Amino acid sequence: ACSERGIAVLTLFAFSSENWRRPRPEVEVLMHLFLTTLRREIRRLDVANVRLRFIGERGAFAATLQEDINKAEQRTAGNTGLTLVIAANYGGRWDIAQACQRVAEDVAADRLQPGDITADLLDQYACLADLPEPDLFIRTGGEQRISNFLLWQLAYAELWFTDVLWPDFDGTTLDQALA
């Protein structure tokens, strides 16, 4: 539906860094769902010319999931259609912190001077540095908050909230959000 509407990049919040606080059995179900969905959908996404990217801290995931994530990115790296970004074990605060850590490393290594640090420079260290900032944030399920998602990148995005649950979100609902 996104490609048909001229949308070049879609970022989905699949697993928040805060989700680790859920009960262990629930986290295990989510991890199993994540892995099985990735394995089931990767061929279809590749055939559809979708480029798959993942953002977030991968180190907390099981080795098999990390391997499948890497394989999916490699398999679709040359695709030129929709870029589908999956935020997994991601949090906006984490993204800002990791960007600041990387800037600090470059300052310590004399690759940057403290006076070089600007908002534009920090953009270059964020997870989505090579992609355009989001134009639109859609939150489903009746919640009216951004829940630590793309905090830096959503600064100028339109925010659209709907009571429609994610599994029921369809092209008609997308058209309403885009209107």
Locations of regions flagged by a protein language model:
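Flexible, compositionally biased loop and terminal segments
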Residues: 1-179
